């Protein structure tokens, strides 16, 4: 072996020792710090993805609940509408029947009044006719009795 090779080996050993002592630790520290940042970033991304999935599921559940509640409210409104319509229909039928009954009563009353009036007129005409036939005058009291009699018979 010659001295040059030995000098180069010693210089190389010193260079490796110097690098291992002063250069290598900061490089390793920077690499480890970078690895830690990357790992933290990846775990944060995974957590964010999980949180996003959870938020989407929660939003989906809330949307389903809101749709269900809206459907329930619509069904209740339709039931109430039907109930109101049925009540109004029943009230209208009762009012109709009341009006018909009242109209029939008024009609019957008017019919009876007209019938009585007609009876009186017929009785008066009969008395006048009988008076003319007999050509004699009947006193007022006798005429009233005859009219009442005829009215009762009609």
Curated annotation (Swiss-Prot):
One annotated Gene Ontology cellular component of this protein: proton-transporting ATP synthase complex
Q: Name one GO molecular function term.
A: proton-transporting ATP synthase activity, rotational mechanism
Classify the source by domain of life: Bacteria
Location in or out of the cell: Cell inner membrane
Query: Where is it mainly found?
Result: membrane
**What NCBIfam families does the database record attribute to this sequence?**
ATP_synt_b, PRK05759.1-2, PRK05759.1-4
Subunit details: F-type ATPases have 2 components, F(1) - the catalytic core - and F(0) - the membrane proton channel. F(1) has five subunits: alpha(3), beta(3), gamma(1), delta(1), epsilon(1). F(0) has three main subunits: a(1), b(2) and c(10-14). The alpha and beta chains form an alternating ring which encloses part of the gamma chain. F(1) is attached to F(0) by a central stalk formed by the gamma and epsilon chains, while a peripheral stalk is formed by the delta and b chains.
- Name listed for the protein in its UniProt record: ATP synthase subunit b
């Amino acid at each position: 072996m010659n001295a040059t090779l030995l000098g180069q080996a010693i210089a190389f050993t010193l260079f490796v020792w110097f690098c291992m002592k002063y250069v290598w630790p900061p490089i390793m520290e920077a690499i480890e710090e970078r690895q830690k940042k990357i790992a933290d970033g990846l775990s944060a991304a995974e957590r964010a993805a999980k949180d996003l999935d959870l938020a989407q599921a929660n939003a989906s559940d809330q949307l389903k609940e809101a749709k269900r509640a809206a459907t329930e409210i619509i069904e209740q409104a339709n039931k109430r509408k039907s109930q109101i319509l049925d009540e109004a229909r029943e009230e209208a039928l009762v009012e109709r029947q009341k009006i018909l009954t009242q109209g029939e009563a008024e009609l019957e009353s008017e019919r009876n009044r007209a019938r009585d009036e007609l009876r009186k007129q017929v009785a008066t005409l009969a008395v006048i006719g009988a008076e003319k036939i007999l050509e004699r005058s009947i006193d007022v009291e006798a005429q009233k009795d005859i009219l009442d009699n005829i009215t009762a018979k009609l």
